[in-house]
Swiss-Prot record:
Binds 2 [4Fe-4S] clusters. One cluster is coordinated with 3 cysteines and an exchangeable S-adenosyl-L-methionine. Residues 144-375 form the Radical SAM core domain. It comes from Nitratidesulfovibrio vulgaris (strain DP4). InterPro entries: Elp3/MiaA/NifB-like_rSAM, Methylthiotransferase, Methylthiotransferase_CS, Methylthiotransferase_N, Methylthiotransferase_N_sf, MiaB_methiolase, rSAM, rSAM_horseshoe. One of its GO terms (cellular component) is cytosol. Catalyzes the methylthiolation of N6-(dimethylallyl)adenosine (i(6)A), leading to the formation of 2-methylthio-N6-(dimethylallyl)adenosine (ms(2)i(6)A) at position 37 in tRNAs that read codons beginning with uridine. Residues 4-119 form the MTTase N-terminal domain. Belongs to the methylthiotransferase family. MiaB subfamily. Residues 378-446 form the TRAM domain. Its cofactor is [4Fe-4S] cluster. Monomer. This is tRNA-2-methylthio-N(6)-dimethylallyladenosine synthase.
Amino acid sequence: MHDRTFHIETFGCQMNVNDSDWLARALMERGFSPAPFGEARLTIVNTCSVRDKPEQKVYSLLGRIRQATGKKPDAFVAVGGCVAQQIGSGFFSRFPQVRLVFGTDGLAMAPQALDRLVEEPDLKLSLLDFSEDYPERDAVLGQGAVPASVFVNIMQGCDNFCAYCIVPYTRGRQKSRATGTILDECRALLDRGAREITLLGQNVNSFGQDSHGDGTTFAQLLHKVAALPGLERLRFVTPHPKDIAPEVVEAFGTLPNLCPRLHLPLQAGSDRILKLMGRRYDMARYLRIVDDLRAARPDIVLSSDIIVGFPGETEEDFMETMGALETVGYAASYSFCYSDRPGTRAEMLPDKLSREVKLERLERLQTLQNRLTERCLQDMVGKKVEVLLEGMSRKPGDEGDSWQGRDPYGNLVNVALPQGSDVRGRFLPVVVAQAKKHSLLAEQAGAPW
């Protein structure tokens, strides 16, 4: 029998992580078994091309895979995700050990393709075409209970074509899943032990409004999912500020299980740069959304994405972004230096900034964000919250076991419990005792449930 061991390396966003989790379960249902890096016959690399750095890491990883598996003559590699969609069959000539290249829509057929490749060692395949409809996958939940916190894709692709972004080219145009299919998957996960669901999409606000949708709005979907029996917490990522509907804002005040944390990407605080980016909102519009969210849910916590050093960004533009961070008071922001992405409008813009200027501005912005994050965490001290426990902490407690999980605001919380406690996937009432740099320490304040 042929060796059917596999190992998956994942780069990029939560959608990629979710894709890799599904692929692993699908392969195990087909008789494959996971193995450590360098020991598996099949290594799958799920790639990201949103920025240049993850893309370069992929090429470096492929070189390390070749070294690690050099003594296994039948070892081979499958490359999937956004870089695979972008480079395509070019991987075959550059990296001879690559035998499958699958794009973002091709993921659904990857398990069948890998079955063939294991049995036919001279075969190479590519799955790079975009499908007309959402590329629905086989329902694969694996054996036993699922994690307490799970992710559900509700759409694929994006129609926004922001000037800097390669996603519409690598994940295709927007395609919404059928509402009934989404609800069926959510019910199945809840039946298997899930208690928190995060809905995933490139632009969740426009769910259902493309030609592939069934007319259900995102706000309506939120209400349908929130009403499912057994769902204790609901989250979603990622909305686009230009599309966020009043009904979605209102949901934060009317749905008790919709968590009071929202990732609302700003990208830049300068109206001039926002226009160059093609974001189709200005700071006044963005701040009105923030005010409306806080009116609907006063304790809501916000996070953001920020691009530093977009072509033509002046010091004045950058200081407007710094001011926006302070005005909104983000609990966290994911900030990066701008990098050209092939085929995007921004690649052709003049007035590119030097690497030194971009790095200097990024350091200033992250220093400010660290201060804002510490302030937000400090504000949690003394508050009682429910923590969904995900597993043991890396560092054991002084007495007993140390567990960690997330509160409704998305904060990482560590709490000491009696040794031998079996509380994975359960909620625990705690009182926050101390704020650390990026997490909280808490004390048990009730029985787990």
